[in-house]
Design a protein with these regions (language model features):
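Acidic/histidine-rich catalytic cores of soluble enzymes
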Residues: 6-7, 33, 132-236
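Generic structural signal for well-ordered alpha-helices
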Residues: 21-23, 52-59, 93-97, 131-138, ...
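Glycine-rich, proline-tolerant flexible connector loops at the mouths of alpha/beta enzymes
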Residues: 34-58, 112-118
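Active-site acidic/histidine proton-transfer and metal-coordination neighborhood
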Residues: 15, 19-20, 57-65, 78-180
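Active-site-proximal loop/turn and secondary-structure-junction residues that shape catalytic pockets
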Residues: 12, 37-39, 76-78, 112-117, ...
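Hydrophobic faces of well-ordered beta-strands that scaffold small-molecule active sites
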Residues: 2-9, 33-35, 69-74, 108-110, ...
Length: 278
């Protein structure tokens, strides 16, 4: 069973200097974070603003606070069918591999582009674009010894366990990993408990050993099927079943990162999350 390490997404704490950000995360009771410079650090509007001095200050802050960089978040659109746009997004990842390595981040991470961002593009075409992006990214990650985690999201290009398995099998890189957000696998039509359990079975048996990080957030559904964010207590997600799967995995440790964290609720959120670890 992995040792689960409770963390939080950095930009839920607002924009700060690296020292103030990691200090706030640690003081809230979290041991690790997902750091996205363009969302969480003051003065960073683009990756051009991520300077060697800033990265060095981040490494120092991590050492001082003991808050690990579990995921180096890049938030890029790897599934753009437009080649010029796709290559520009891929270039952002390539530019950050050295920084992720220097910070000893557990992995880099990205989602795979909402389908709504490119109307008229089929999911098949979006997935083929994703494969092209990963084909460019993974050799550089392998050379640097950096893991790259992609996240399955219900309304994105890579949207099901089946699609995730296809991407992993096609790319076949030992450095390609999965960020597992239980809530992001679920839509209104598969929110019933037995349907969720079938998904967890697929995730665990098909690629559970490839999971490099876990995201934890609350979701429920409106009568029209649209989803909305909730507190963890009001969520319809089957955390018990999901963690029953995660507890069977061979990884020595896994970060579990609270997304949409409210710092004032950190203590109750941590208690809620950690009840599923054993």
């Amino acid at each position: 069973m992995p040792a689960f390490i409770t963390g939080a997404r950095g930009h839920d704490f607002g924009r700060h200097s690296p020292a103030d950000l990691l200090s706030a995360i640690g003081q809230a009771g979290f041991a690790c974070t997902q750091l996205a410079y363009t969302k969480a650090v003051e003065g960073v509007k683009s990756y051009a603003d991520v300077t060697p001095a800033l990265v060095a200050a981040t490494k120092e802050a991590a050492a001082q606070t003991g808050v690990q960089i579990a995921v180096y978040g890049t938030y890029v659109e790897l599934s753009y069918a437009d080649e010029d746009k796709r290559k520009a997004e891929t270039a952002k990842v390539l530019s950050q591999i050295g920084n992720a390595n220097y910070l000893a981040a557990g992995c880099m991470g990205s989602e795979t582009t909402p389908m709504a961002k490119q109307p008229g593009v089929s999911r098949k075409d979006a997935q083929e674009a994703l494969l092209r992006s990963l084909g460019e990214i993974m050799p550089a990650c392998e050379e640097a010894g950096v893991l790259f985690g992609i996240e399955c999201v219900y309304h994105h290009a890579m949207n099901t366990p089946e699609a995730t398995k296809m991407v992993l099998d096609t790319i076949a890189s030992p450095n390609l990993k999965i960020i597992c957000d239980l809530a992001n696998y679920i839509g209104a039509e598969n929110a019933a408990l037995d349907a969720q359990r079938r998904i967890w079975d697929k995730v665990g048996s098909w690629y559970g050993d490839k999971i490099c990080a876990v995201h934890f957030k609350g979701v429920a559904f409106k009568p029209d099927g649209s989803h909305y964010s909730t507190s963890l207590e009001d969520s319809v997600i089957d955390y018990a079943g999901g963690f029953a799967m995660l507890r069977q995995l061979p990884q020595a440790s896994l970060p579990v990162l609270r997304e949409e964290a409210v710092p004032a609720r950190a203590a109750s959120d941590i208690a809620f999350m950690e009840q599923f670890y054993k």
